[in-house]
Structure formats: structure tokens, C-alpha cells
């Protein structure tokens, strides 16, 4: 065990392991999962981490191949405002009716349908230099039929015992009514009211917990090497003859 610790200290394996873990986490296809109910709006991403001047592209697909320029057709692009101009938002192609709104580093889906893509990808590009590595988001849909209010239980039981054709037909058409998918006539800035989406914030916190753990490990490593704790332990073991052996195979006692 002591030889293993000595080998780790001498070759800085602990520091390299932390760097390797950060690289794998950064370039892995780890998607932030966002839970949303079918028919509700949802906001992906957050305004944190956005640097002024960045152009943000959103794709309704996985991030695989985005960096290589393969099949990269953004559904929404946030173009930061130029000095003296108002902000601009482009959707390519322009959907009808409007389904997406992007602002800074967030994408607001105004109405989530069952047929919508599950994977979304965000890529930030500074005015000069290379674009950042894309970030992946995954939608986890909850069906409306799986959740019922407590006051609806009596009505549902009554429908089972005394069926009413008119009521059942009304329920059926209500579930498939095209009005559920009507998003026209929405006020400007509609998506801004959903930036406080609770599920999105929970997902953001869960994804950032891995980075917090890595930062804590780095701080511990810096403290250890700043106070020269590994070197002191090594010198202490050297005086006790734990690290080196003489020609006879026994620990030295110099």
C-alpha cells in the first residue's frame, strides 16, 4: 500500500487522473435531462455562462456530429445585438406557428408535443475563435393521462359505473382537440415567463454537481501540494525505511 502511494506521489498520477476525468466529462455525450408534461412549455438551458457577443445555435438533434458540421441545421439562432441595435432572433427554417424562442443561452419550447424530438443541442460561438463544445439536452415527457387531481376520482368512478356517451365523447375530443396545439396569438416575450421552470433548474443543478465534485478534488490536490504534505509524508517514510530497500532486500535505516 505504501509503495502504491509512493508511486502515485512520484508520478503525479492523482493529478493526471483528475485532468483525465475532466476531459472525459467535457467531451462525453452526457445530456441534461429535463422533465416536462406533454402540452406544457419548457425552457432548456439557463442564462448563466453566456458571454456577451456569443452567437448561440440550437439543434433538435443529438450533439454527435455537430462539431464536425454534419447535418447542422439550427432550429433557432440567437444573434447578439450590435451596438445601437435591438436584439435579433432567427429561426431556420421559420416554423408555422412559432414553436421556439431563443434568448442568450436558453431555448424555450412554447408547446411540447409527443412527436417533438427528444434530443436538443446547444452550441455557443464567440465573435472570434472556435466555437465551444456543444451541450446536449434530453426531454423526458410525462403524459397528462397519468396524473389526475384528487377531486376527479369520483367523476372517473362514476363514468365507469354509469357510462355516458356524450361525456365520454367529450373527454375523447378534449384529449385530441387541435386547440391544445394552438400557440398563435401569443404575446411577445412569451418564453421569458418560463425561465423559472423548476424542472429545468433541478436538471441544471444535477448536471453542475459533477463539476462541483471535480472542483473540490482539484482544491484538495492544490492544498496538498501547496503545504507539501505528500513531500513531508515521503520524507517521514524515508526516515523509517519504508520506501527504499538495501542490497540485502531489507529496508534501510539510514
From Swiss-Prot:
It is a single-pass membrane protein. It is found in: Host membrane. Belongs to the RL11 family. Residues 166-176 have a biased composition (Basic residues). The keyword NAD does not apply. One of its GO terms (cellular component) is host cell membrane. Coiled coil: none annotated. This is Uncharacterized protein UL10. The gene is UL10. Keywords: Host membrane, Membrane, Transmembrane, Transmembrane helix. Residues 163-182 are annotated as: Disordered. The chain crosses the membrane at residues 207-227.
Amino acid at each position: 500500500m505504501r509503495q502504491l502511494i509512493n508511486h502515485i506521489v512520484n508520478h503525479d498520477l492523482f493529478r493526471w487522473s483528475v485532468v483525465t476525468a475532466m476531459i472525459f466529462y467535457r467531451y462525453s455525450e452526457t445530456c441534461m435531462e429535463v422533465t416536462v408534461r406533454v402540452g406544457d412549455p419548457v425552457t432548456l438551458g439557463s442564462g448563466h455562462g453566456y458571454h456577451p457577443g456569443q452567437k448561440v445555435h440550437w439543434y433538435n438533434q443529438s450533439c454527435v456530429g455537430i462539431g464536425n458540421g454534419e447535418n447542422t441545421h439550427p432550429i433557432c439562432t440567437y444573434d447578439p445585438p450590435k451596438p445601437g441595435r435591438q436584439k435579433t432572433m432567427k429561426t431556420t427554417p421559420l416554423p408555422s406557428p412559432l414553436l421556439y424562442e431563443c434568448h442568450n443561452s436558453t431555448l424555450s419550447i412554447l408547446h411540447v408535443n409527443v412527436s417533438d424530438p427528444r434530443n436538443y443541442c446547444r452550441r455557443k460561438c464567440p465573435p472570434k475563435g472556435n466555437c465551444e463544445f456543444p451541450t446536449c439536452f434530453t426531454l423526458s415527457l410525462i403524459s397528462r393521462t397519468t396524473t389526475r387531481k384528487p377531486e376527479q376520482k369520483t367523476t372517473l368512478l362514476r363514468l365507469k359505473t354509469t357510462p355516458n356517451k356524450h361525456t365520454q365523447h367529450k373527454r375523447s375530443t378534449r384529449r385530441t382537440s387541435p386547440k391544445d396545439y394552438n400557440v398563435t396569438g401569443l404575446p411577445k416575450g412569451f418564453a421569458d415567463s418560463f425561465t423559472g421552470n423548476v424542472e429545468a433548474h433541478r436538471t441544471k443543478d444535477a448536471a453542475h454537481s459533477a463539476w462541483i465534485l471535480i472542483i473540490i478534488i482539484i482544491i484538495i490536490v492544490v492544498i496538498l501540494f501547496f503545504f507539501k504534505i505528500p513531500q513531508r509524508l515521503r520524507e517521514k517514510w524515508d526516515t523509517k525505511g519504508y520506501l527504499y530497500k538495501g542490497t540485502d532486500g531489507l529496508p534501510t535505516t539510514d
